[in-house]
């Protein structure tokens, strides 16, 4: 799938929202990619993750585990793992930190792909990477549906976004939408 096709899909599914949003990173933006509206349709989730898996296979990225941060990375981790025929875990926030729960554990010889729905600053992805490394695993790649940083994020491992866009973000104190008094909406999962 090409970038423009995915962008069109966001538009067709009304999954590219416009307004005033507070992102999981704490930054504000006038656009929000609601990936849940895409992954709610199993055939779309499967197709997107198979496309990501093809990119990883083409570059000979080998892993035995895919981990996604909750909530946006859960379905993606499962579908990526299914496409790659490996296990899928998800990390969830507990007391402000990403943790593996539910009996999930990373072993020292695990090679892990971290998958996320949208990357803005890469904060949640880095938290999962740190978690994997703290348990002795090796992160071999990062994948996402959307890189909205304009290519500015560097994870130190190969990064595979399906869609790269440069969408304006603002610190809350410099946000023109706040200055105009436009109410802010927080559609993401981080509190």
Curated annotation (Swiss-Prot):
MF GO annotations: magnesium ion binding; orotate phosphoribosyltransferase activity
Residues binding orotate: 120, 148
The protein's annotated pathway: Pyrimidine metabolism; UMP biosynthesis via de novo pathway; UMP from orotate: step 1/2
Enzyme superclass (EC): transferase
Reaction(s) this enzyme catalyzes, per UniProt: orotidine 5'-phosphate + diphosphate = orotate + 5-phospho-alpha-D-ribose 1-diphosphate
A matching Pfam family: Pribosyltran
Cofactor(s) the protein needs: Mg(2+)
GO terms, biological process: 'de novo' UMP biosynthetic process; pyrimidine nucleobase biosynthetic process
Keyword Magnesium: yes
Key word Magnesium present: yes
Entry keyword set: Glycosyltransferase, Magnesium, Pyrimidine biosynthesis, Transferase
Binding site for 5-phospho-alpha-D-ribose 1-diphosphate: 116-124
Transmembrane feature ranges: none
Enzyme Commission (EC) number: 2.4.2.10
Family membership noted in the UniProt record: Belongs to the purine/pyrimidine phosphoribosyltransferase family. PyrE subfamily.
Function recorded in the entry: Catalyzes the transfer of a ribosyl phosphate group from 5-phosphoribose 1-diphosphate to orotate, leading to the formation of orotidine monophosphate (OMP).
PANTHER family: OROTATE PHOSPHORIBOSYLTRANSFERASE, URIDINE 5'-MONOPHOSPHATE SYNTHASE
Complex and partners: Homodimer.
Protein name per Swiss-Prot or TrEMBL: Orotate phosphoribosyltransferase
Source organism of this protein record: Carboxydothermus hydrogenoformans (strain ATCC BAA-161 / DSM 6008 / Z-2901)
